[in-house]
Amino acid sequence: MLELIRHLCLLLVTISVLATDESFKQRSEILTNIVRLAHDTYDDLKTAPPSYDKLEPARIQVLLYVSSIDAVNEASMDFTVGILLHLRWTDTRIYHDKAHNLFLQSKLQSLDFDSENIKKVWVPDIFFPNEKKGSFHDIMTQNQMMRLYQGGTILYISRLSMTLSCPMDLINYPFDKQTCHILIMSFGYSDQDLVLDWMNLTTADDLTMNPDGKAIVVDSEVLLPQFEVKSVIPSFCNRRYHQKAGNHSCIQAEFHLARNIGFYIVQMYIPSMLIVMLSWISFWLTVNSVPGRVSLGLLTVLTMTTQSSSVNAALPRVSYTKAIDVWMSTCLVFVFAALLEFAVVNVLSRKESISGFSLKNVFTLPKDTDKEDGPLNMAEMTVPLDGFHEAEAQKKKRFNKRGIVYAIYVDMTARVVFPICFIIFIMSYWLYYVNAE
């Protein structure tokens, strides 16, 4: 019994395969006959647009399915995409009376072209004006298809990968928003012979192909490391190559991209803020800590310079100041000012010691020594002649102490002024550039 069931199953599978093969052969023969009959009737089936003899433009409807956005490169000002290009037009030369009868007899709704028959019919001479480089996909087989529907409507689909030019305005970098385009045009026909339009998805077949009903679809799996795709807008862009060539029909897909700021906060802004704050440690070291304060100041200045250079290494050399340049330059000014502050302090306090001073002297500057000591009255000074030099030394010591007080006062003022100024800069910077368009 089991053996009988096994043989019956094998027989059913064989019949199904043979029926499928017979159906495919029948479809292939019908399509070959349709194309052959069209070639016998029309000599220009491959070379001329469908409505060329009727003095009206062929209307090509376009749909883009964006399967990937691989990279957006600021340095080379371009972006790389993978797309499925859908073109739809009507060619009544192929759907002649005999073709109509063959469709009715076979009860077929559509016929798929093989690669050989695709080469025998007219296909729009579409090109991408802002393309830098591109390629068709042909792994295993050529990634293209053509389908003929009743009434002569043809659907052509091809898979492409392209790198396209994308001029960028980096004045607000890295808070910038960019708009990149995919331009689509006819290469050889003016708008009197060929007109491009975005596909109007209204029929059930169209909505099955694209349930959203949009002429541009971005795959839900598309994720960019640095950008977020805010919107993709279809629009028109008629262009003229030459005065005598006429206008060429052109459509474009506008990709509105917003840069994700998270990476730059972690890799640029926080490290530079920490470097600036590190330079403030100098204000808390003693006035006499010359090696430590010099080393710290030079280290922070060199670190900021290196970081600024590494940031700009990945960007094009533009003639305007970017937002990141404002940040890095200001941070460099802060760390340089901290080093300069030490130079001022060192000049004020290069004498010997500050012994005998209390913390009260830091906030109350010494009064004029002439007032403190009173007028020098020779009658009141009863010092021996050999004590004259000792009095002069005491007077110098008082002036040395006064310079150190100024130095400490500058240090303590810097401890407050530098952080306040930096906080004001941070708030102003972020409020301005985050809200900048």
Name these PLM-found stretches:
Residues 6, 273-278, 328-343, 412-431:
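Single-pass alpha-helical transmembrane segments
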Residues 2, 15-295, 310-327, 347-412, ...:
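Non-transmembrane, solvent-exposed beta-strand/loop segments in proteins
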